[in-house]
Amino acid sequence: LKLDLHGWNTDFACWCSYKYLNSGPGSVAGAFVHERHHREKLPRFAGWWGHDKNERFLMEPEFKPMASAEAWQLSNAPVFSMAVHRAALDLFDRAGMDALRAKSEELTGYLAFVLKTISAAHGDPFTIITPDDPAQRGCQLSLLVRENGRALFDTLTRNGVVVDWREPDPSTSLRAGVIRMAPVPLYNSFEDVFRFGGILDNALRS
């Protein structure tokens, strides 16, 4: 999804980078703080890395935050994970978010078509519970599998498909689990989705 946090008048936002930004487990998080809060004396978990960098090493007793989102930093970031993150962001910059979003809508739309076609052919064993409107979703689709969902997940995994599994909600009587899948526009292709459809179809037949 394309974000416009400032334009949306968002106060604060935070996110991880390990999955969709390709930075790996344990990588740095990101944070957004609207500029109207930059000079406010808000309660915060303050760290020395958020102190005014021109006076940081004076070791004064009072915290003097930087006038930006940097003021919410606690300590210096880990160098090795930052290097991986930088390389990942360079790839996104080269590809361009407009192009990635356009491909994402087409690729995820194609996956939804494939899933609905296969589900109808097998008596609707699963339902896509992700919003149908492309503007209301990213590239991930979640399937609510009515029966034998874990077995279906295991079969897909054995066939080289990287998806993940969420156990049924224990607070309800519904015993349907969820399989989540995401055709990532940076490196997945329409052929990948087509081949996945064949694997899923064969898995349901077996």
Describe the residue ranges of each PLM region.
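Alpha-helical structural signal in soluble globular domains
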Residues: 4, 8, 110, 114-118, ...
